[in-house]
Amino acid sequence: MFGVLNSNDHRAAVQQRNTPAFGRTSFELWTDNPTSNYRCETGGNGRDSGQNRVRRPMNAFMVWSRDQRRRVALENPQMQNSEISKQLGYQWKMLTEAEKWPFFEEAQRLQAMHREKYPDYKYRPRRKALPQKRDKLLPAASSSMLRRQVLVDEKWYPFTYRDSCSTAAHSRMEDQLSSSQPVNIANSLLQQEHHYSSTSFRDSPETLATHLSADPPFYPK
């Protein structure tokens, strides 16, 4: 026989199940998961975050512009960062070699410290995302067959052509469509259709016969 729990015992059991282990914080419970630890160290997406990435040592211009950029930004709050960079680049070019020399010395000192701290450091520029080609964006069609409709005597008739049809032949079709002889257009298009169909089914006579019998002849009114 199963014992019946009263309301107090049931409430205590629910609270104990929802309460973390005694003497342990929620941070300790969260770090029990190795996947969570890895995400925390790498920035959440499995890659090295910007904080863990070793930065290049500053050059002379960066040492000089570090304080100058802050000053220009305070004097011109509405100026964009790109405009500030252009202005600083122009000012740096206007400095003499004697004025630039202290910043070159500071840059050399920072580079020496960087080599001591990171002896195996190698500069790895970030790869720029290349735009995908248009042919890769479009899904590959299962068949290279294209269909169009031809207007003859105010009636639409389907017309099929394949990749074997050259651009010149297709342009001739367009010229024929613009002419004033709809009956001749229909006959020429049907002849080309049967020509390409017979070419594609040349290896199979039975299939060719079935294909030709399935298409009824066209008699213009």
Swiss-Prot record:
Is Transcription one of the keywords?
Answer: yes
Q: Which UniProt keywords apply?
A: Activator, Calmodulin-binding, Cytoplasm, Differentiation, DNA-binding, Nucleus, Sexual differentiation, Transcription, Transcription regulation
**PROSITE patterns in the record, alphabetically?**
HMG_BOX_2
Keyword ATP-binding attributed: no
Biological process (GO) annotations held by this record are:
cell differentiation; male sex determination; sex differentiation
Quick one: a GO cellular component term?
nucleus
Q: Where does it reside?
A: Nucleus speckle; Cytoplasm; Nucleus
Gene Ontology molecular functions: calmodulin binding; DNA-binding transcription activator activity, RNA polymerase II-specific; RNA polymerase II cis-regulatory region sequence-specific DNA binding
> Which parts of this chain are annotated as the region Disordered?
194-221
Q: Which Pfam families match?
A: HMG_box
On subunit structure and binding partners, the annotation says: Interacts with CALM, EP300, HDAC3, KPNB1, ZNF208 isoform KRAB-O, PARP1, SLC9A3R2 and WT1. The interaction with EP300 modulates its DNA-binding activity. The interaction with KPNB1 is sensitive to dissociation by Ran in the GTP-bound form. Interaction with PARP1 impaired its DNA-binding activity.
Q: Which family does it belong to?
A: Belongs to the SRY family.
Q: What's the protein here called?
A: Sex-determining region Y protein
